[in-house]
């Protein structure tokens, strides 16, 4: 895809969820500092990105045709210049209403070492909220 996206380090937002980049930074990413660090040997490295109802944000580009394809390599560069590489494996989409934070699909500090990039999807025009989430999984390349 050829995307060079800055990565912010974030904690929890005002609702207690892992933070996201500011809405004005549509092509930035946000690493949740309470998840394993990029390059870790275990668990989900949680990264959040935005998608917009009218397109034109990183999450839209990842999901829509021409976006991430199985086997694509994602390079994550830390503040000290260290590089961790991941190979995109799959994406899942699920309704927010059925999500269980204890399921391990997003929060997982002990499982296989992988990126878990999440974006919101299916904006509800009535409520202004997003009814679905998409998680893109990429395995750590050693």
What are these regions (language model features)?
Residues 1-142:
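Solvent-exposed, non-transmembrane regions of membrane-associated and secreted proteins
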């Amino acid at each position: 895809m050829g995307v060079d996206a800055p990565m912010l380090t974030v904690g929890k937002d005002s609702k207690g969820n892992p933070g996201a980049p500011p809405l004005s930074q549509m092509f930035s990413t946000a690493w949740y500092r309470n998840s394993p660090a990029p390059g870790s040997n275990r668990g989900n490295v949680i990264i959040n990105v935005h998608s917009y109802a009218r397109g034109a944000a990183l999450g839209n580009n990842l999901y829509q045709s021409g976006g991430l394809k199985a086997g694509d390599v994602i390079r994550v560069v830390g503040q000290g210049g260290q590089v961790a590489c991941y190979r995109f494996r799959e994406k899942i989409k699920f309704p927010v209403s059925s999500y269980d934070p204890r399921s391990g699909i997003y929060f997982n500090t002990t499982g296989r070492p992988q990126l878990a990039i999440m974006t919101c999807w299916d904006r509800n025009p009535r409520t202004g909220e997003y009814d679905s989430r998409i998680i893109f999984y990429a395995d750590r390349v050693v």
